A protein has these predicted regions:
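A glycine-rich (often HGG/GG-containing) alpha/beta subdomain
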Residues: 1-59
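Glycine/serine-rich phosphate-binding loop and adjoining beta1-alpha1 elements at the start
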Residues: 33-131
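Glycine-rich phosphate/diphosphate-binding loop of Rossmann-like nucleotide-binding domains
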Residues: 120-148
């Protein structure tokens, strides 16, 4: 997602430790430095977390629509590389179904906005108008492009 990295895996042994070691290697960082930023979920807790993320219940802006799209894009890439397997395929499809149900059966998406939209609204509250003021967008992602 925009403000974090989520890694999903299924298997035996200490997968969390193996993934953290791999991530540290990729980032050229020490495992100890990364550990304080890592949350690990297993079994039912992991499934619950995935469903909350997919449904945008675990995001900076409740109901943010971009997260589900990011998850689907990541799933498509992983699936194309044959990196998901039967159980993760089923789990992710279920997560997509749960997310759709949450969006259609609750009001979670009724006031959903993006982080960039929230930032612009806050700036308007502070300055009254953006006319005559300059702003700098840090980052070059899709959200920055949409707010020009």
């Amino acid at each position: 997602t925009c403000n974090r990295v989520e890694l999903l895996a299924m298997g035996k042994g200490d997968l969390a430790g193996q993934m953290l070691n791999s991530w540290a290697g990729v980032r050229n960082a020490k495992v100890e430095d990364l550990e304080r930023y890592v949350y690990t979920y297993k079994n039912e807790e992991a499934v619950r977390h995935l469903f909350r993320v997919a449904s945008s219940l675990d995001s900076m802006i409740l109901g943010e629509p971009q997260i589900l799209g990011q998850l689907k894009a990541a799933y498509r890439k992983a699936s194309a590389c044959h990196a998901t397997g039967v159980i993760l395929n089923h789990l992710l499809h279920k997560a997509f179904s749960v997310a759709k149900r949450v969006r259609t059966e609750t009001a979670v998406a009724s006031s959903a906005v993006s982080i960039s939209f929230a930032a612009v609204e806050l700036a308007k509250r502070i300055f009254g108008t953006m006319q005559g003021h300059k702003a700098m967008l840090i980052g070059a992602g899709e959200m920055a492009e949409r707010r020009r």
